[in-house]
């Protein structure tokens, strides 16, 4: 996920993206708990993408955008 692409999105789009990422993270955890072995690198990627989106949402809140 590219930060520059995320910066061009509105707050509503970022919130939608965050919700999708949280669902993806939940599904990965369920797969791991269910015995399936998902690719471990996906946990790190999704966690960092969530952090990026939350950071940009905070920036937009502070700038009243």
Curated annotation (Swiss-Prot):
One of its GO terms (cellular component) is cytosolic large ribosomal subunit. Disulfide bonds: none annotated. GO terms for molecular function: structural constituent of ribosome. It comes from the Bacteria. Pfam families: Ribosomal_L29 (PF00831). InterPro entries: Ribosomal_protein_uL29, Ribosomal_uL29, Ribosomal_uL29_sf. One of its GO terms (biological process) is translation. Keywords: Ribonucleoprotein, Ribosomal protein. Belongs to the universal ribosomal protein uL29 family. PANTHER family: 60S RIBOSOMAL PROTEIN L35/50S RIBOSOMAL PROTEIN L29 (PTHR10916), LARGE RIBOSOMAL SUBUNIT PROTEIN UL29C (PTHR10916:SF0). This is Large ribosomal subunit protein uL29. The lineage of its organism: Bacteria, Pseudomonadati, Pseudomonadota, Gammaproteobacteria, Legionellales.
